[in-house]
Each structure stands twice: as structure tokens, then as C-alpha cells.
């Protein structure tokens, strides 16, 4: 009678590649009270040799690639190694214990495993003193899962994983593997189809178009402990973000700078320009350059386009050493249809949302995630926790939140299925975003979350406890749209669009807002910021300086996409560096210097950031001069402050040697910033000493200017401020109220 390990059914499953529990058959098995047996499977091998406690022995050959060697009772995995056909001598993968435990299983299938990135994927480790790599993957509908790579000739039958739970988690420890090993998953689906897949939990990948996963050794020695300890104190400080696409900021010898080359250059530039943070367009791995990183296939992996895993850690560490925070763009709303990645992962739509008639997102032709599955939510949650824990990022900007919140986003009637209450809200996505924010803020206080959300969905930045989503900041897309819409209008038409400037103040404090001029506004025919401005070159540059000043003065945190700070002329393209040579031209030099000084003033002025989410931080002075396009307001650090900043914006092209503003009683008024300074390329007007006028004198001036009739007694008289108002400029004054 054949020994049990030659059971026909077991062997057939193993040979046919459908064995889901190879650990039960292979490795060290008990044969009798006094004897164990080492059972090996080597498809295609004629002989197999085993080194047992220093002695080389030939294993018995059975059939169909099964080999065995009788050994004394109590042999351990460390006691023997197996010779492979390529000459490799390694320990037996199937002799080592499985480590995925009940707690792992419970947390993962509940969607709450907060260190899943240390369990799933390829994890270098040591078991019983033997180094190697532990492979774990979730594929509940696969008949068989194997890890394939250079180490086994990419042969799917050599290293099948063991199914450790009835919910589809597979595991195998491969001794002797080290960092740098390349691998993929080979799966047999329920229908018998063989699939080759990249690892969703892979920490690094070969350069595109290769999709091979790479084992990494996370041994970087960080030097930013002081930054991390102080990070929570910075959350209420100024926030002036420089949005950067790594591959097109600056090139060298016709190629983008790598992470290490970029680190010092970008850090010094940000310090010089007084930016507090950089926000990186997605550096998660992605197959298509033209997606800018927003179609992610490696949610746990930095893209290899610009260097190694450790190189990106060095970049972030360097930014922290220079006092610059790092925010990561992250895309949990959809993923690409590329067959090598997550789509149809185990032969079924494992990660995909399938309840709509078409599974593809109509805007991007991508799949949306199924947030009803705890394992999918845990995959996404684990990704963001990985970037915070292992890569030390300081903030997460969630892309396309609106597409997550609404089931009908981009879809017409009949193309979507309502929620259980008959509504359009994606209740599972809402629950996930609440979990996302709750976990981050509890586990990593000081790490900030940002929502790119373009609708009026309520309570984006309200705490989860109060029924909100729990984000720290929401991108103010309405402000950005209205502001740029106004600036694109030629000067004669602007009086008819003054509401573009005033309307955003009606909702400016309904959320904690960030004011962006982002990459999306300088591509696809929208023109660069300077290209949006009407008029001749002088007026265009004056308007850009005015725009940058307007953004700095408005309530909300700041974000500017690279190139806007010096008047990049062409639209942005990911396939070339910014046009840095423009800084040899005086107009561009002027904008650059103006941006630098505006940023410095912002960082140094608590009136512009300390309470910018509160209505008490903003008070209108005047927005009635629609014809000339003048608005003015005060900014306060707190409601009771006597010190304030007076911000005056002139969106027209006229020059007013004497312009009278109604104002609260003032003790002093001093000019801090004038974007019409000749140093910035301006006309040099606006520097006359402002005159504070009592109500009586102010009334006389208004009568003389024809603004009111001499016998007009309507309304109370107010103080006045007589300033020199240059064309197309922002003026910022420091004022002391009586």
C-alpha cells in the first residue's frame, strides 16, 4: 500500500496545480512513532538531494515529481536543506509553521487590521533562526495560488501557497530569499484559468512597463524624530503648500531628478520661497505616465521611476530636516483596469464595485472600489497607514472624494443603483472615509487629511463624532473656480462678475478650507495661470501678482502648483521640466520675487492663518466699488485683536492717486506689501503714505468726489483712509484699531 503522501487524490491536485493545502502533504510529516519523513515536490526533477545535518542524501523518487526521505523522529526545519536544479541549496518552505493567526484573520475580515502592511505581501523575516520571505495574499476564489519568480524559474507548481483560512488567505514562507527578489502571483481560478498578477500589497515594482513585484528591506535609518515629535504643534500654524509633480519639476541631462537628487534642491527652494509643505502628485506606483499617478496599481509602493524605496524615504527625511512637511496625493476612489493588477484579481471582481449595470467609471474608464467589503477597506486603510508609518508622510490628500460619496457620480438615470434608503449617497464609502479619518487622527495625531471634494456635501471637515467625515481640510473648489473665472474676464466685463469675488465669502467658514490653484487648472487647454490673464504682457503679469496676493490674503490655507510662482508660460506637461529659463526674463523674475515676499508675509502674519476658519477672522471694509473693481477687508488673528491686516485688491486698470476707503477708527496704518512695486515689475505706484481721515473730513472728501450729496444724511458717517491705489495690484497694510 502506498504511503499516505502518495494518495492519488492529493498527488493529482498537486500535479494539476489545484492543491490548496500543500502544507498538509509536504514538509516534515509523521510516519510512525519512531520515524518522520521529508516529503518534497519537484516537478520535472529526476533526482533530488537533501543535505541533512551536514550529510548529503538522495531522496526516494516516487512518481509525478514526489520525492521523500525517511528521517528520525524530531527532525526540525533547520536540520536539512534541499538542492534545487539551479544549484541553490535552501531550506524546505513546507517545513516551517504558518504564522497568519486567528487575530489576523478576525481583524482583516472585519476591516480593522491596522498593521496589515506588515502581514500581507512579501515580508522579509526570520522563522526559527532561518531568514527568508513570508508571502501572504488574499484570493478567496482561487483554486491555487503560487508565488513565482527568478528563484523558482517562474514555475507555478514549485511554490504553491497554503490556504490558511476558509476566507481565502494564502501563505508560504520561502527560506533564503532576500531583498531584491522579484515575484508575482500565479493563480488558478474557479474556472481553471491561469492568471499572473502583481502583488496588491507589493512594496516596490520593476520599472514600467514591467509589473514585477520586488521584495524590499525596510532598514532606512530615519533622522527626523524631532520633526515627528513637534509635528502636532505645527497643525495650527501657517500652511503654504507647494504642489509638485516629481517627474517634471526639474530635469538634469534630459532626465527627471531622482528622489535623492530632488531632495536637497526642492527642500532649499521651498525654504527660500517660504513654503511650509510640499504636496506630491501621486508617487504610488502606476503604469501610465500620462495618468500623473492618479491611476494607481501599487498602493503600498513608491514608483520606481525616480529611484528606490529607500530613496523616497531619504527624500522625505531630507524635507523634514529642512522643516518642510510632505503631503501625499492618494487615490482610494478608483483603480485601473490593467489585467496584471487588481482587476478580476482571483478570477472574480474581488476589489471592484459591481452593483451598477456597468462596473467602469464613466469619467476615467476605471473600476471603483467596493467599500462594502471589509477586506477592501482594510486594503485601503492599510495603504494610508503604511505611508504614514513607514514613509513618514505628514498629510494625505484624498483625490476625487465626490466620486466616492455619490453612487450616481458621472452617471445618468438607469446607470446606477440607489442605496438601501433609495438615495444617491454611497453609504459604504461614507463609512470608510469616517473610519479612515478616525484611525489616522487617533493613531497619528498631527497628520492632516485633505478632501478634494467639489460638491456641497455637508460636514466634510466636521468631526466623525458630530456626524461629519472628519477631514482636517477641504479643497475650496468653488472659490478656485469663481476666482479664476473672474480673472479670465477682460477688464470691461469684470464689473458684471463682481459676485465671483464676493459670493465665496458666504460659505467661506462653513468648512475648514484650503484655497488651491492646482495642477488641474493649468492643463488640457485651460492655459497656465499667466495665460489666463487678459491684456498685454505688463497687465498679465500685474494680474498674476494681484492673483497671488489675493490668494494669500483670503481666509483658508494655501496651495500653488509648481510654475505658478514665476509665471510659467506654457501649460504644464508631465513630459518635460518647468521652464526655469524664464527666470532670466525680468517679468518672471518680478513675479518670482513677489511670490517669495507674499509667502514670507503670510508665514509671519498670524492674522492670515491663526483663525482663518472662523468668521471673526474676516471683516469686510468695502466691496461696493464694482465699476473700478476694488474690494477691501480686514483680517484678524482673533476677534478681540486691535492689530489687523487691511487687504485691498484693485482688479481694474485705472490709477487713483487718492482713493478713499471707509474704515473703522484707526490709530495707525502702515504699508507692508505692494504687488505694484518696481522690484516686481510694477509701475511703482501706491507707496504714498496713507492718510487716516476723521468722519467729518472723510464726509467732505466723499462729497467732493461726488460719492454722496451734501445734504445726504442717510447712514452714519465713518472714518476714511486715503490711499494711493495702483492699477491691478494688491496692497496689504498693518493697521491698529482704536
Curated annotation (Swiss-Prot):
Signal peptide: none annotated. Pfam families: Alpha-amylase, Alpha-amylase_C, CBM_48. It comes from the Bacteria. The active site is at residues 399, 452. SUPFAM superfamilies: (Trans)glycosidases (SSF51445), E set domains (SSF81296), Glycosyl hydrolase domain (SSF51011). The keyword Glycosyltransferase applies. One of its GO terms (biological process) is glycogen biosynthetic process. It catalyses: Transfers a segment of a (1->4)-alpha-D-glucan chain to a primary hydroxy group in a similar glucan chain. Its EC number is 2.4.1.18. It is an enzyme of class 2 (transferase). GO terms for molecular function: 1,4-alpha-glucan branching enzyme activity; cation binding; hydrolase activity, hydrolyzing O-glycosyl compounds. One of its GO terms (cellular component) is cytosol. Coiled coil: none annotated. Keywords: Carbohydrate metabolism, Glycogen biosynthesis, Glycogen metabolism, Glycosyltransferase, Transferase. Pathway: Glycan biosynthesis; glycogen biosynthesis. The keyword Transferase applies. CDD domains: AmyAc_Glg_BE (cd11322), E_set_GBE_prok_N (cd02855). InterPro entries: A-amylase/branching_C (IPR006048), Branching_enzy (IPR037439), GlgB (IPR006407), GlgB_N_E_set_prok (IPR044143), Glyco_hydro_13_cat_dom (IPR006047), Glyco_hydro_13_N (IPR004193), Glyco_hydro_b (IPR013780), Glycoside_hydrolase_SF (IPR017853). NCBIfam families: branching_enzym (TIGR01515), PRK05402.1 (NF003811), PRK12313.1 (NF008967). Monomer. Belongs to the glycosyl hydrolase 13 family. GlgB subfamily. Catalyzes the formation of the alpha-1,6-glucosidic linkages in glycogen by scission of a 1,4-alpha-linked oligosaccharide from growing alpha-1,4-glucan chains and the subsequent attachment of the oligosaccharide to the alpha-1,6 position. This is 1,4-alpha-glucan branching enzyme GlgB. The lineage of its organism: Bacteria, Pseudomonadati, Chlamydiota, Chlamydiia, Chlamydiales. The gene is glgB.
Amino acid at each position: 500500500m502506498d504511503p499516505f503522501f502518495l494518495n492519488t487524490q492529493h498527488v493529482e491536485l498537486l500535479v494539476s496545480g489545484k492543491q490548496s493545502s500543500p502544507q498538509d502533504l509536504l514538509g516534515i510529516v509523521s510516519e510512525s512513532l519512531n520515524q518522520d519523513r521529508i516529503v518534497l515536490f519537484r516537478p520535472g526533477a529526476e533526482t533530488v538531494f537533501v543535505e541533512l545535518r551536514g550529510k548529503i542524501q538522495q531522496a526516494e523518487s516516487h512518481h509525478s515529481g514526489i520525492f521523500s526521505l525517511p528521517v528520525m523522529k524530531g527532525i526540525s526545519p533547520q536540520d536539512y536543506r534541499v538542492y534545487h536544479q539551479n544549484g541553490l541549496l535552501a531550506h524546505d518552505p513546507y517545513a516551517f509553521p504558518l504564522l497568519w493567526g486567528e487575530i489576523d484573520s478576525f481583524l482583516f475580515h472585519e476591516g480593522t487590521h491596522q498593521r496589515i502592511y506588515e502581514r500581507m505581501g512579501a515580508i522579509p523575516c526570520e522563522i526559527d533562526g532561518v531568514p527568508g520571505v513570508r508571502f501572504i495574499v488574499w484570493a478567496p476564489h482561487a483554486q491555487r495560488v503560487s508565488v513565482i519568480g527568478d528563484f523558482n524559474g517562474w514555475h507555478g507548481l514549485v511554490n504553491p501557497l497554503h490556504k490558511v483560512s476558509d476566507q481565502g488567505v494564502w501563505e508560504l514562507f520561502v527560506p533564503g530569499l532576500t531583498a531584491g527578489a522579484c515575484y508575482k502571483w500565479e493563480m488558478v481560478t474557479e474556472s481553471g484559468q491561469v492568471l499572473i498578477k502583481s502583488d496588491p500589497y507589493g512594496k516596490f515594482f520593476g520599472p514600467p512597463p514591467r509589473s514585477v513585484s520586488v521584495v524590499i528591506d525596510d532598514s532606512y535609518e530615519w533622522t527626523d524624530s524631532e520633526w515627528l515629535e513637534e509635528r502636532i504643534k505645527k497643525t495650527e500654524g501657517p500652511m503654504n503648500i507647494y504642489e509638485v509633480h516629481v517627474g517634471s519639476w526639474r530635469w538634469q541631462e534630459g532626465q527627471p531628478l531622482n528622489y535623492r537628487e530632488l531632495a536637497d534642491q526642492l527642500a532649499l527652494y521651498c525654504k527660500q520661497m517660504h513654503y511650509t509643505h510640499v504636496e506630491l502628485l501621486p508617487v504610488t506606483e502606476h503604469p501610465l505616465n500620462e495618468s500623473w499617478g492618479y491611476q494607481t496599481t501599487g498602493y503600498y509602493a513608491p514608483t520606481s521611476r525616480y529611484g528606490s524605496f529607500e530613496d523616497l524615504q531619504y527624500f522625505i527625511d531630507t524635507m523634514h530636516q529642512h522643516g518642510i512637511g510632505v503631503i501625499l496625493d492618494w487615490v482610494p476612489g478608483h483603480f485601473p483596469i490593467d489585467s496584471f493588477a487588481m482587476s478580476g484579481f482571483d478570477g472574480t471582481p474581488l476589489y471592484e464595485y459591481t452593483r451598477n449595470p456597468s462596473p467602469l467609471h464613466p469619467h476615467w474608464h476605471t473600476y471603483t472600489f467596493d467599500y462594502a467589503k471589509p477586506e477592501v477597506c482594510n486594503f485601503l486603510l492599510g495603504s494610508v497607514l503604511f505611508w504614514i508609518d513607514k514613509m513618514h508622510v505628514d498629510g494625505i490628500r484624498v483625490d476625487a472624494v465626490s466620486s466616492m460619496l455619490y453612487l450616481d457620480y458621472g452617471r445618468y438615470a438607469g446607470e446606477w443603483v440607489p442605496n438601501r434608503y433609495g438615495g444617491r449617497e454611497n453609504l459604504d464609502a461614507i463609512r470608510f472615509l469616517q473610519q479612515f479619518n478616525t484611525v489616522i487622527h487617533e493613531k497619528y495625531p498631527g497628520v492632516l487629511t485633505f478632501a478634494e471634494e467639489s460638491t456641497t456635501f455637508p460636514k466634510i471637515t466636521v468631526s466623525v463624532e458630530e456626524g461629519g467625515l472628519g477631514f482636517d481640510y477641504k479643497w475650496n473648489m468653488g472659490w478656485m473656480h469663481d476666482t479664476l473665472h473672474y480673472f479670465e474676464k477682460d477688464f470691461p466685463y469684470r464689473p458684471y462678475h463682481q459676485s465671483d469675488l464676493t459670493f465665496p465669502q458666504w460659505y467661506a467658514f462653513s468648512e475648514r478650507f484650503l484655497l488651491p490653484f492646482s495642477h488641474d487648472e493649468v492643463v488640457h487647454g485651460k492655459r497656465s495661470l499667466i495665460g489666463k490673464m487678459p491684456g498685454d504682457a505688463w497687465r498679465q503679469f500685474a494680474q498674476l501678482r494681484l492673483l497671488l496676493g489675493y490668494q494669500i490674503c483670503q481666509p483658508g490655507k494655501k496651495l500653488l502648483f509648481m510654475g505658478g510662482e514665476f509665471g510659467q508660460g506654457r501649460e504644464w506637461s508631465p513630459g518635460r521640466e518647468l521652464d526655469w529659463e524664464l527666470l532670466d526674463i525680468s517679468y518672471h523674475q518680478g513675479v518670482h520675487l513677489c511670490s517669495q515676499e507674499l509667502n514670507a508675509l503670510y508665514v509671519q502674519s498670524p492674522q492670515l492663518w491663526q483663525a482663518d476658519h472662523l468668521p471673526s477672522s474676516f471683516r469686510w471694509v468695502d466691496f461696493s466699488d464694482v465699476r473700478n473693481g476694488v474690494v477691501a477687508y480686514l483680517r484678524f488673528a482673533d476677534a478681540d485683536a486691535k492689530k489687523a491686516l487691511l487687504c485691498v485688491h484693485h482688479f481694474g486698470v485705472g490709477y487713483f492717486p487718492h482713493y478713499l476707503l471707509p474704515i473703522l477708527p484707526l490709530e495707525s496704518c502702515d504699508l507692508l506689501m505692494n504687488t505694484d512695486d518696481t522690484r516686481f515689475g510694477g509701475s511703482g505706484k501706491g507707496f504714498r503714505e496713507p492718510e487716516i481721515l476723521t468722519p467729518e473730513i472723510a464726509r467732505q472728501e466723499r462729497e467732493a468726489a461726488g460719492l454722496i450729496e451734501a445734504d445726504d444724511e442717510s447712514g452714519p458717517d465713518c472714518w476714511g483712509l486715503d490711499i494711493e491705489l495702483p492699477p491691478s495690484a494688491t496692497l496689504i497694510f498693518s493697521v491698529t484699531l482704536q
